[in-house]
Amino acid sequence: MWCKDPFLTYLKEFGYNVIRLPKADVKPLQVLARCGKDLNRLGEINNLLVAGDSIPLPRLKENTRAASISGQRTGDLSVGVGLSILGTVLGAMGGSKLGLDTKYQNAKTTMFEFQDVFEDTVEIIELDKFLGDADINPFSRHVAELLEADDLYITTSTIKSTKFTIEAKKSDGTALELTIPDIQGIVGGNVKVSGAASVTSKICYESPIPLVFGFQAVRLFYDNGRYTAIEPLDSGSAGMKALGKAPSDGAARLMTDGPFLRLTGV
């Protein structure tokens, strides 16, 4: 059993899993492989499965306003977890986090607020029908073996935003006020920093492009090369990340918990 990881669970109450490094190109119908608490992104579903004669790929619904998430806040997070999340967001935006911890050194807790959140999604019923009609690509070797071992997942929904707002509080529960120009000087020009006033406890970090920061997925079950079932991935149970680096040669490799431990050339 794994210890509870607050980084993984901060989106749980909203029904999503986290993307450890938010990205612009994460979307539904992508293939993931589990490695411990994380899921590695492998590629598009149409590179693994060949559509049958009757059912096409599910239709992607893009840029639907996620009204249930926009304007919502997380619960209180420790300042360490909050700054870790903020650091990954700033890194994805092309900003710097060096020196930011000194500005938040008097903070005890942090809270994130999600603004202008949009969702890309596919209907799970349509995906279920597609999987029932599709065949495994005959040229897929290692990933097809992972599919047969029930180690693969398909993304079904992603949430994205250009704005990530964080509010910090001190140990006595009062707001920690920060100076907007000071924060802007630390993170750099790639990130727009704003607030209700030049000195404020609630700071919005804005990217020029939407970044995907949460996802939903289903696990695939296959038997003798045929699709049998799907199972929703529990929210807050896993994080998505890029392929890891092998320590010996630096090459990207797919690592899994199953018998197929290292696959090169993915």
Curated annotation (Swiss-Prot):
Q: Which UniProt keywords apply?
A: Antiviral defense, Cell inner membrane, Cell membrane, Cytoplasm, Lipoprotein, Membrane, Palmitate, Transmembrane, Transmembrane beta strand
Transmembrane segments in this chain: where?
69-85, 97-115, 163-180, 189-205
Q: Where is a lipid covalently linked (S-palmitoyl cysteine)?
A: 3
Question: What are the annotated GO cellular component locations?
Answer: cytoplasm; plasma membrane
What name appears for this protein in its UniProt entry?
Gasdermin bGSDM
Q: Which organism is it from?
A: Desulfuromonadales bacterium
PTM description: Palmitoylation helps stabilize the inactive state; may self palmitoylate. Palmitoylation plays a significant role in pore formation.
Q: Which family does it belong to?
A: Belongs to the bacterial gasdermin family.
The record's comment about this protein's domains reads: The N-terminus has marked structural similarity to the mammalian gasdermin N-terminal domain. The C-terminal region wraps around the twisted beta sheet core, probably stabilizing the inactive state.
Q: Does the keyword Cell membrane apply?
A: yes
One GO process term, biological-process aspect: defense response to virus
Report the coiled-coil segments: none
Superkingdom of this entry's organism?
A: Bacteria
